[in-house]
Regions:
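Glycine-/charge-enriched secondary-structure boundary and capping motifs
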Residues: 2-8, 25, 53, 115-133, ...
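N-terminal amphipathic/basic leader segments beginning at the initiator methionine
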Residues: 2-33
């Protein structure tokens, strides 16, 4: 009677070991002196940074959504790891946390060592941009749960904040100014609608030219990471809103008290050309709910600090905070 191996059941331990060897130098390149120990332990260890009066640990988790489908179908896995880090650390800094370390979860039907290595290379690059360390991860090969070519990602960012700086909402006042930090594209939201319009309705192809670039490169442009800008501008920022799913209209109110609303001048927003293409086929109200419309982060700033923020960033004015029921008014 023949014996059945784990590999026969669809799980290749040797491939997993090969993958780990591939990513070791990528992971180590993100380490700072705060990382204790090496790779291969049961848990990652990170020495808490000093200099805080009342340090508070912050954690954020997210994924990349159906942008992964474009990476899988195009065979370009090099940027979605950056997206994964960005979606987590950009949330973290909105609570005035400084990212310390990152962990990832990679699940697939059949481990493609080359593709997985490319993904982790992107995660490592994202960690470098966010100035945090990749100290752990899990690779799950699950035949029957996913098709062989599919994979999914989840990320987990942990950072430190000063306890006294956590409550940003109560600091927002009437007359505060709204500054938009540009996005690099769709970031990691709205791709189900993007795919519906571009590939089902318009029958576009990955290699179609769009503004001098292959369309797929425009769509897979990685999410911008705002950590370094946050660190540079922190003293001049009252609050920050990461513009993700729900767009400006649903994310900006998250940093407003109940008695204040944000008046945003729609004409001041600078959508990228790819958004203009979508606008021809999607209602404008839906556009502002599904996409960031070229705005990756909104900063709430005191009027006297506006010049310093504008000089220290590529941001631009989009509105003000006014008294009234909490909402966003696009005018």
């Amino acid at each position: 009677m023949s014996q059945i191996s784990y590999k026969d059941a669809g799980v290749d331990i040797d491939a997993g070991n090969s993958f780990v060897e591939n990513i070791k130098p990528l992971v180590k390149a993100t380490f700072t002196p705060h990382v204790l120990g090496g790779i291969g332990s049961f848990a990652g260890a990170y020495e808490l940074p000093t200099g805080y009066k009342e340090p508070v640990m912050l954690a954020a988790t997210d994924g990349v959504g159906t942008k992964l489908k474009l990476a899988i179908d195009s065979g370009n896995h090099s940027t979605v790891g950056i997206d994964l880090v960005a979606m987590c650390v950009n949330d973290l800094i909105c609570n005035f946390g400084t990212p310390s370390f990152f962990l990832d979860y990679y699940a697939t039907g059949k481990l493609d060592v080359s593709a997985a290595t490319s993904v982790v290379a992107g995660i490592a690059e994202g960690c470098k941009q966010a100035e945090c360390s990749l100290i752990g991860g899990e690779t799950a090969e699950m035949p029957g749960m996913y098709s062989e070519d599919d994979y999914d990602l989840a990320g987990f960012a942990v950072g430190v904040a000063e306890k006294s700086e956590l409550d940003r909402v109560s600091l927002v006042k009437e007359g505060d100014v709204l500054i938009a930090l540009p996005s690099s594209g769709f970031h990691s939201n709205g791709f189900s609608l993007v795919r519906k319009v571009l590939f089902e309705k318009l029958r576009m192809k990955f290699d179609d030219d769009f503004n001098g670039r292959p369309l797929i490169d425009v769509l897979l442009e990685p999410t911008r990471i705002y950590v370094k800008l946050f660190k540079a501008l922190k003293e001049n920022i009252v609050a920050m809103a990461h513009i993700t799913g729900g767009g400006i209209v649903e994310n900006l109110p998250r940093v407003l008290p109940d008695h204040l609303y944000a008046e945003v001048q729609k004409a001041s927003i600078r959508p990228l050309p790819i958004f203009e293409l979508l606008k021809e086929h999607v209602d404008e109200t839906e556009m502002y709910r599904a996409f960031n419309m070229g705005v990756g982060m909104v900063l709430v700033v005191r009027p006297e600090n506006v010049d310093a923020v504008l000089k220290g960033s590529d941001g631009y004015l989009i509105g003000t905070v006014k008294t009234g029921e909490k909402c966003v008014k696009l005018s």
